[in-house]
Regions:
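Structured, hydrophobic secondary-structure cores that serve as assembly/anchoring elements
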Residues: 39-323
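Long, low-complexity, polar/charged, intrinsically disordered or flexibly structured peripheral segments
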Residues: 1-32, 37
C-alpha cells in the first residue's frame, strides 16, 4: 500500500521465521539471502542488483544485527529493521542505550532501525484478546522509500506519512522524538491525524554526517553501482588520452542527468579520473558531490583493478566528507 503501486516489480520474498534469520549456529537462511544479494551485485552487469533489504521485527543481539549490517553494506543495499516492541518512550531510550546498537562502524550506515510499532488491528474482546495487535514499521517505511525520490528522506508531515495506519504503540512528545532521533532510531509518530516516520538517521554515529543520513547513503550507493556497471563495460580498453576524455564525458553526462531540484544531487565535480602511474592496471576516480540533505560536500572515491580472471574488474568505493 505504501509503494503506491498496483504491483511491485523486482521483489523477492523469503518465508522465514525470525528464529531462522537470527540463528548464527545454523545460518541457512542468512547464507541464502547473502548469496542472493551477492549473486546480483558481484557481477559485471548490475542492472538486476537489489536496493533494499527488509527484515521486519527485532533481530536481537549486536552479533546478529552486525552480521546483517555487514551483508547489506558489502552488497550496497539498505537494511530496514525494527527495535523491540516496547510500551513507553522511556523504555525505548533505556533499552536502546544499553543495547548499544548504533556505532561508528561503516556498515552501520546501511542500517535503518524503526521504533514505536504500528497498530495492525484493534483487539477482539469477544475472543478474549487483551491487547491490540501491533506490527513492526520497517515494511511500511520500506514501501514508502520505494515510492519516494531517492534523495528525499521519508520523514515528516509531507513525505513521511504512512498509508492505512491508524495509530502507534505510544504517543511521543517533541522532546522525546528529538532524543530518540539523536540516538539513531527512526520513531513512528502519530500527529496531524496521520502516522509518519520522523527521522532520516542510520545507526552510524561517526563523524561523517552523510553516512548518518540514509538518503545520502542510498544515493551514493546508487551512483557507485551505476559507475561500477559502466566502467565494467569499458574494462580492458587501452588507456589513452582519448579513452580518458571519453570516460570523463560519459560520467559527466550521467551525473548531469541526476543533478537538479527534482533529482538526486545538488551539484558535482569530477576531480580525478586517471590511470595509476605506478600500477598501470589500476584506475582512480574521485567525484566531489553535494547532496541535498545534509548540505555538506562529500567525495566518492572509486578504485578499480583488473581481476585474476579474463574480463574481470574489481571495484572498491569509499565515501568521505569534504573537509
Amino acid at each position: 500500500r505504501n509503494t503506491e503501486s498496483q504491483k511491485v516489480k523486482n521483489i523477492t520474498i523469503v518465508n522465514a521465521e525470525m528464529d531462522q534469520l537470527t540463528d548464527l549456529d545454523n545460518p541457512v537462511f542468512i547464507d541464502y539471502i547473502s548469496n542472493e544479494l551477492k549473486h546480483n551485485f558481484d557481477r559485471l552487469d548490475l542492472r538486476r542488483n537489489y536496493s533494499l533489504l527488509v527484515i521486519p521485527g527485532y533481530l536481537g543481539s549486536n552479533a546478529i544485527l552486525d552480521k546483517w549490517g555487514k551483508i547489506a553494506h558489502s552488497n550496497k543495499v539498505m537494511l530496514l529493521t525494527d527495535f523491540q516492541d516496547l510500551e513507553t518512550p522511556d523504555d525505548v531510550v533505556d533499552v536502546f542505550f544499553n543495547a548499544d546498537h548504533s556505532g561508528g562502524d561503516i556498515y552501520k550506515s546501511n542500517i535503518i532501525m524503526t521504533c514505536n510499532w504500528l497498530l495492525g488491528r484493534q483487539k477482539v474482546v469477544q475472543v478474549g484478546e487483551e491487547d491490540n495487535l501491533y506490527v513492526p514499521g520497517s515494511s511500511a517505511l520500506a514501501g514508502k522509500i520505494y515510492s519516494t525520490l531517492m534523495s528525499q528522506v521519508v520523514a515528516g508531515k509531507k513525505f513521511g506519512g504512512l498509508n492505512d495506519v491508524e495509530s502507534v504503540r505510544f504517543d511521543l512528545k517533541k522532546s522525546e522524538i528529538s532524543e530518540i532521533e539523536r540516538m539513531g532510531l527512526v520513531p513512528m509518530v502519530n500527529e496531524y491525524s496521520k502516522v509518519m516516520a520522523f527521522s532520516a538517521k542510520t545507526l552510524f554515529n561517526g563523524d561523517n554526517l552523510g553516512l548518518q543520513t540514509y538518503s545520502v547513503v542510498r544515493v551514493f550507493d546508487y551512483i557507485s553501482k551505476v559507475l561500477f556497471d559502466f566502467l565494467n563495460r569499458r574494462a580492458f580498453e587501452n588507456w589513452t588520452t582519448r579513452t580518458e576524455a571519453d570516460l570523463r564525458s560519459q560520467i559527466v553526462k550521467f551525473l548531469d542527468s541526476i543533478q537538479g531540484p527534482t533529482r538526486l544531487i545538488e551539484k558535482f565535480r569530477v576531480m580525478r579520473i586517471e590511470q595509476d602511474p605506478n600500477q598501470k592496471d589500476r584506475v582512480l576516480l574521485d567525484i566531489h558531490i553535494t547532496p541535498y540533505f545534509p548540505a555538506k560536500s562529500f567525495v566518492i572515491q572509486l578504485e578499480g583493478r583488473k581481476g585474476e580472471e579474463p574480463e574481470e574488474a574489481n571495484w572498491e568505493s569509499q565515501y568521505s566528507q569534504d573537509k
